[in-house]
Amino acid sequence: MSELTPLLKASINFAYIGAFVFVALGVYLSYRRGRLHPLLLLCISAISFSWIEAPYDWAVYAQFPPAIPRMPSWWPLNMTWGGLPASVPPGYIAYFVLPAVIGVALGRWLIATFQWRAPLTLLVTGLIVGSLWAFMFNAILGAKLGVFYYGYVIKGLALWEGTRHQYPLYDSLAMGVQMMVFTYLPGRTDT
């Protein structure tokens, strides 16, 4: 695929626009509060561990279409097959912060509606929202529709195993665990 499809363009726009919106909102809320807002801290956290994408891609042989613009060749962590897509670092903000915001809203609604305990509700909500988000984003949008592919998966722990569209289910679980933290931190109500 030598040119950007509408899906690839939408994915790249999601990365850049999502990052801009969340960082701008985090800066605004921090300014208004007079101290760092949890949303800005999530943005900083998300982009700070975007470095892991290259070694992760190398380990599972993640492959991106060649039409996606790449980081320059001198980029220190350019281990991804074909080079790391330039939209990955800002994309981490949009990819990780949006499900956290959804998890916080859903968790707070569940707490208010059913009078459930806040910490446990936020953690479980984060696990479920994060797992579903990763499945929809990585399995369906990514692997099934062709934004990227997984070259290797652990036998028996993948969907569509052995095909170009194979997806490791443990990827969804890992995202769920990450979202437990990302949902709890901004969702907690103690000061």
Model feature map: region roles:
Residues 1-191:
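Aromatic-rich, lipid-facing transmembrane alpha helices and their immediate juxtamembrane interface loops
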